[in-house]
A protein has these predicted regions:
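Conserved active-site alpha-helix within GNAT-family acetyltransferase domains
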Residues: 134-150
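A short, internal acetyl-CoA/4′-phosphopantetheine-binding micro-motif in the GNAT/acyltransferase core
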Residues: 95-103
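Conserved acetyl-CoA-binding loop-helix of GNAT-fold acetyltransferases
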Residues: 103-117, 139, 143
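A conserved beta-strand-loop-helix scaffold within acyl/acetyltransferase catalytic domains
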Residues: 31, 35-87, 95
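Conserved catalytic-core motifs of GNAT/GCN5-like acyltransferases
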Residues: 129, 147-164
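Conserved GNAT acetyl-CoA-binding A-motif
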Residues: 120-130
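Glycine-rich acetyl-CoA-binding "A-motif" of GNAT/NAT acetyltransferases
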Residues: 73-76, 136, 163
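A short, well-structured alpha-helix characteristic of acyl/acetyltransferase catalytic modules
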Residues: 1-52, 175-178
């Protein structure tokens, strides 16, 4: 299951490749384009935290981080997180897009591709965990057809010390496509 999830993906003008060292500088530069956004993320992929955060994501054998492309342009990143082969569940998260791609439909195309791959690989439940302060991401989850299951109060302490409430969304295999 995990091996299939880690394969490159492509479709609808976009693609996703598993993060490798050849992507480090380009992804770091893309993540630096919106330094203020990292305040509402659990981890800091801005210039002063990028290397530590990418190392943290890559350190878990249950995570797979992808570099995203719009055509030939490096567009951002997203990950399969906490892949649980026993429960057939995972989270899609750690998603960041360069500012000029937000609201362009890129998110929908990438998420469709990642969701389809997950379900085709045997996953039955996909979760999305969003800081309650992140209205844009919550709206995007609703557009995808994800069900808002509730709020995990004081769920985690983010990189900047904020005690975060997390909105939990999910999509089940038998609910997809919406």
């Amino acid at each position: 299951m995990i091996e299939q999830l880690a394969q490159p993906m492509a479709g609808d003008g976009c693609r996703a490749e598993l993060f490798g060292e050849q992507h480090r500088d380009g992804l770091r530069a893309a993540c630096a384009e919106d330094r203020n956004i990292w305040a509402i993320y659990a981890n800091n992929f801005g210039p002063d935290g990028f290397d530590d955060s990418i190392a943290l994501y890559r350190s878990s054998p249950r995570n797979r981080t992808f570099v995203l492309f719009e055509g030939h342009e490096l567009a951002g990143m997203s990950s399969y997180l906490t892949i649980d082969e026993g429960r057939h569940c995972l989270e899609i998260g750690g998603t960041y897009y360069r500012p000029h791609l937000r609201g362009s439909g890129f998110n929908r195309r990438i998420k469709n591709m990642m969701i389809e791959r997950a379900f085709d690989s045997g996953i039955r439940r996909i979760e999305f965990r969003v800081d309650v302060r992140n209205a844009r991401s919550q709206a995007a989850m609703k557009k995808l057809g994800a069900v808002r299951e509730g709020v995990l109060r004081a769920d985690r302490i983010t990189w900047n010390g904020h005690v975060r409430d997390t909105a939990l969304f999910s999509i089940l295999k038998d609910e997809w496509p919406v």
